[in-house]
């Protein structure tokens, strides 16, 4: 005999409604949210008044590099101090010898770590250059397909070495987009490329040719970084790409004069520019709250995990929210609530999935049950993820993947 519901989550605290509800699910959709749902059901979860959240969004990762520092008593690569050039050089050495199977294994390990922590959506930037070729892209796309019932992965064909530094990058990016990458990305058009106009124009040319969005790394600080982001926003408008471009990192906002940002915010809003800051590297003076209050779309992300760029990381966005609040010295309930939005609804907007995201009737049943009373306490307590639901199916229970 058929049941009215495939799954009901009972006594779920929904922070957006500030009350406790039942959530009724059929297939992969939420079909009812009421104080008490009646009807027959195949499976039930009692949240016991604890917080139920939409799945977390990790809006900027590098899954093809993950776990490359592991396997020895001390983390590989980390006998030397960090510099950008050293990390790029170590990456080139790695990709020269890495196998398809090794990269794919690391991607799957990364994804499983994310899923255990309740992350159900991620965007990963995959190196494409004359050394890596499309080796990493092939491995990531294959893993993405195998992981589709656990996590949604967007893949950026990323010119890590620079379009104008590594002249094979353009043709290899084209090949990667032909293979099915979802976005195109570049890096530091000023200090890496030494050609702001040329690199941005090439990125838009590729994006428009393949009808994909753009996600651009801009680490540059000060006036150089602000200029690069402003030109990216201006070109977004000129190319008819409003709402389709993301700037990742944007460290320059942390040291730019406040009046510069005040002048630029209308441009960013007009262009629909999206931003991502990564909790492992967010500068302490990053004006996160100011940007959010101004209506700028700002997500949060883990960035690299245990590789030649960063020796640490575990793909846990709730831990990331705690790190972010501590780096920025945020303490109020309101501010912690805003940080929570960065790993949920703001991240969903960055990925362009907001129409199907959230706890509302008709939206996808991608949910996390936490051992916590609220988002604020979840961050403070580092709450356990009691249950993770993807497409209406329980995929994690008691911190074990069961799907």
From Swiss-Prot:
Residues where Zn(2+) binds: 60, 62, 217, 303
Keyword set, alphabetical order: Cytoplasm, Hydrolase, Metal-binding, Plasmid, Zinc
Biological or metabolic pathway of the protein: Xenobiotic degradation; atrazine degradation; cyanurate from atrazine: step 3/3
First-level EC class: hydrolase
Pfam families: Amidohydro_3
Regulation of its activity: Inhibited by N-ethylammeline, N-hydroxyethylammeline, N-isopropylammeline, ammeline and 2-amino-4hydroxy-1,3,5-s-triazine.
Documented effect of changing residue 304 to D: 7-fold increase in kcat with ammelide as substrate
InterPro entries hit by this protein: Amidohydro_3 (IPR013108), Metal-dep_hydrolase_composite (IPR011059), Metal_Hydrolase (IPR032466), Metallo-hydrolase_Enzymes (IPR052349)
Primary location class: cytoplasm
Family, similarity comment: Belongs to the metallo-dependent hydrolases superfamily. N-acyl-D-amino-acid deacylase family.
Name of the protein in question: N-isopropylammelide isopropyl amidohydrolase
Gene: atzC
